Amino acid sequence: MKNKVRVRRARSTDAARIAELSGHLGYPTTAKQMKARLKDVIEDKEGACFVAESGEGGLIGWIHVSTTPLLEVERRAEVNGLVVDETARSRGAGAILLGAAEKWARGKRCKSMSVRSNVLRERAHGFYLRNGYEHYKTQKAFRKGL
């Protein structure tokens, strides 16, 4: 699969498929909602969304990466989401998407890239470890509606 996967920047016309794939990650949404979110991401100069297309031209995955200037550490990027279609996993598409995000982050002068992964996603943890990431922290996440 590696040599049959093409990565490109996401376009607004990808919204429906990105929404469908988001459901695989446990974040169901509608195509309409995703189109609005994707518009914001596409226009954000501090973020990027890349998609992976199979050799047959179907969209099989996406990655969203962003960077924020920080006071406490050198500039770093963060993977906000990465998903590959369940039928296309373990064939290299995720690593190719991760590579595209890392290249983008280096172009933004980032010194590192981090990712947060649910403690239940053990398969994902192995993926990140195999791709050179290290487990460096365990934390609790808090949120408040505004």
State where each predicted segment sits.
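Extreme N-terminal starter segment of soluble prokaryotic enzymes
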Residues: 5-6
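Acetyl-CoA-dependent GNAT
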Residues: 9-75, 98-99, 136
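Hydrophobic adenine-recognition pocket in adenosine-nucleotide-binding enzymes
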Residues: 10, 82-84, 117
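Conserved acetyl-CoA binding element of GNAT-fold acetyltransferases
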Residues: 75-86
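Conserved acetyl-CoA-binding loop-helix of GNAT-fold acetyltransferases
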Residues: 84, 90-103, 126, 130
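Conserved active-site alpha-helix within GNAT-family acetyltransferase domains
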Residues: 95, 119-138
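Conserved GNAT acetyl-CoA-binding A-motif
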Residues: 98, 105-117
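Active-site/acyl-donor-binding loops of N-acyltransferases
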Residues: 138-145
